[in-house]
Each structure stands twice: as structure tokens, then as C-alpha cells.
Amino acid sequence: MQVFRTGLRFRRPVLFDETGLDKAHIRSLQLIIWAIAFGTVCFNITGGIAMTGYLKSLGVSDFVFGLLVAVSPAAGVVQILASFVLERSRKRKAVLIASGLLSRMLWLPFGLVPFFVPMSAPLIRIWLISLFLLVSACSSQFLVVSYQSLLADIIPLRIRGSYLGARGRVSTIVGIVGGFLTAWLLDIFPGFHGYAFVFGLAALLGSIDITLFFAVGFPPMSVVDKKDSLKLMLSDVLHNKQFLGLVGFVTIWGFSLHLSAPFYLVYIRTSLGMSNTAITLIAQILPNICSVIMLTRWGGALDRHGIRPVMHRIAKWSSIAPLLWFFVVPGPLSLALILITYISTGMLLQGMEIGAQTAILNRSPQKNRSMYIAIYTCVTTLVGHALANAVGGWLLDNPLSSLERLQIPLLGSSLNRYNYLFLITFALRNISAYLLLPRMIQHDQQVAEHENR
């Protein structure tokens, strides 16, 4: 049989500016992008409707739910230890792969808990899933520290914003498909069998994410003449005022986000009665599509205009969304308001995340860089994420429940505890955007002027 050659040649997609980079460097940067794409599906399962439905199916209250979803960010404090271990051992690749595989593979037994602990022992079930969550979260902190340290060394500074935008775009596209598949599986396989399957899928895809790093070329960590003690490392970080200003803003901004973030899904699932597929389409796929459209634009804007003005603009625009949630009550307007909030979330918040990540990479010096990243992540996740989740759950089960009993009318329905939580979120978001961020920008400008004299 004669084979005809068409002369057509297929080029691989160019995801970022490869100018001046050798083939090995380009390949490593590409592998990191494809790795996070697999990881995104894992994150969508373990942090989306599957986790919400699974925990609620186990019968947890809003307060306990808030505590459980806070386990992962609360483990951020372990990053200080992880950074110390990394700086002392200098074995970045081994730390990343070992901790990553452990944290991802634990999702398999996590989803199987209802099959080997009977319904007659609900407390044992809760304690066991808490244990799996805690061990997975703690091992993830070693992964995060080594991964962020790798990014700071392997991504050229001139393309840092656009590269992170391209990485986010690819992972988001994959996440859209994964999110829809997860919701579809949960709807056709209801109950604990469906949850066991999707958490097993999370373990598999999360492990694929980590195994790709075997082929990544890890640049050597910077050589230090003397290894600092943990006390000296911490002291160095805590005397950097510009760095601490960034940490303070991102922490309070994160608190305003995560105070109500896990309860949006609870609210529309219980109060509005949407299916898993409908929730995933609206709460994950729709904002992800918007993120794909905007990510490279935000990345390019960060490279062209700088981090501070872009973050300031995003903060002001996104501070409106929680007010719309306040008016989401059972009725004809609820779907339209939910669509608007998730569209704005997808368009704006990824830009803020890229901006914060670029800022922390730029503001952490090469010496003891992983400790800077550890302190940043520890504070922002422990206070801005974990504490916010727990406080949100406590507010819902206590003072806001009392307000709900007043049955204040709104748009033909009565305000419930979730509406009040969304109103508090709106107030905090505006404080962050209009008071704290401008002060941080002003302080940075004063420091820059002083250094230029």
C-alpha cells in the first residue's frame, strides 16, 4: 500500500513566550502546566459539590461543616516546618513528589469511609474523615512549599504573569470538563457509591499530577554559606515590612471571601433545590469559562501595568458581588443573580489570585525564599481561609439563626441566615478594597521613593 505524504506539519501549541529558553527549560515549564491541569480536576472534586454533598450526607451541621472544610487551610501552619525541612535538606524534588503522592492517594480511603464504618457510629465516621483530611492537608503543605519554591526559580521574571495566566487557562479548561463529569457521575450514581467513585478519581488524577514532576528539570536551590536556624529564618521574614503588608492585605481579603464561600453551594443546594449538575454548571463551569477568557488578559496586564494597579481595580470591581448574594432568595430573580455573581467571580478573582501569587514571588528574596512563601501561605490560609470558614459556620448556627427567626421579608420571601452572612461578606470585601489595599499601595510607594533617594 502506497503511503501519501501531505506535507502538513502539526505544530505544538505555544503556551507562553519561549524566547531565549532552551528545549529542556521549555519542556519543564510545559510539564508543570499539564501537571496542574490534572491536579485541577482533583481540586474541583475535593473542594466542590462532591465534598459539600458528601459531608452533608454524613449529617454534619453547618458549624461542623465549616470546621471540616477549614482543616485543609488550617494545616497551612505546617508550612513553617516544611520550609525549614526544605531549606535544610535542599531536596526539593524528593519532598515535592513524596508529600504530593501521599496527600493525593489519601482521597481513596476518604471516600470509602461509609463502607467500613456503619451508620450506627456517626461520630467514628466524622473523626475518621477528619483524620484523612488532616493527614492529607499536612502532607500537602510540604508539596506547596516545594512547588512554590520551584516556580520562583524556574519561571523567568519577564514572563511570570503571562505564564501563570497560561497555566491557569489550561487547568481551567480541563477543570470545566472534570467538573461536569463529576456532577454527572454524582447524579447518575446517587449516594455513597457515587462519592466513593469520584474521590477515587480524585486520588488517581491527583497522583498523575505529581508523577509528571519526575520528568521536570528541577533547578538547584541557591547555595548558602551558612544554614540559618529556624529563629533566624523567621526573624528575617518578620522584619520585611513590604512583605508583611502584602500578607496582611491578602489575609483580610481572603477572610472576606472564605467567610461565606463554602456556604454558597450549601445554600443553593438546600434552599434553592438545584441538582448537582445544575450547581456544577453554574458554580464551576460558568466561572471557569469566564476565567479562560480573562486569565491571559490579566496575566498580560500584570506584566505591562504592574501588580498594584491591577489588583486594586479587581478588588473594587469584585466587592459588589456579595451584595447580590444578599438578594438571592427563593423566587424568579434568584437564578439571574446567581449567574451574575458567578460570571463576575470567574472574570475577576482569578486575576486577583495571579496578582497575589506574582507579588509574593517578586517580594520574596532568593535566600530562605521557601520560608517567605511558608509564612505567607500559613497566615493567609490559617486566618484568611480556615478561621473564616469556622467563623462563618459558627455565625450561621448561632447569631444569624436568631436573626432568621425574625422572618424579615425580602422580594416575596423571608431573609434567612445565609443572606445575613452574605451581607457581612459584602462589608468586609469593601473594607479590604477601599481602605486596606490603598494603604498598602501608598506604603509601597513611600518605600520605593525612599530607596531611590
Annotate each language-model stretch with its function.
Residues P309-E353:
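C-terminal transmembrane helical hairpin of 12-TM major facilitator-type secondary transporters
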Residues T52-G53, S57, F84-R88, G111-S120, ...:
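Transmembrane alpha-helix termini and helix-breaking/packing motifs in multi-pass membrane transporters
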Residues V78-K91, L186-D187, I293-I307, L396:
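Helix-to-loop junctions at the C-terminal end of transmembrane segments
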Residues G100-P122, D187-I188, K316-L333:
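C-terminal ends and interior cores of transmembrane alpha-helices
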Residues M1-Q30, P114, S120-S130, L134, ...:
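Intracellular loop-helix junctions on the cytosolic face of multi-pass helical membrane proteins
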Residues A37, L106-W107, V113, A121-L143, ...:
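Hydrophobic core of transmembrane alpha-helices in multi-pass small-molecule transporters
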Residues R88-M105, A166, G191-H193, R304-W317:
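Cytoplasmic membrane-interface "Motif A"-like loop-to-helix N-cap segments
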Residues Q2-Q79, S83-L86, K93-I97, S103-G111, ...:
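Helix-loop boundary and gating motifs at the non-cytosolic
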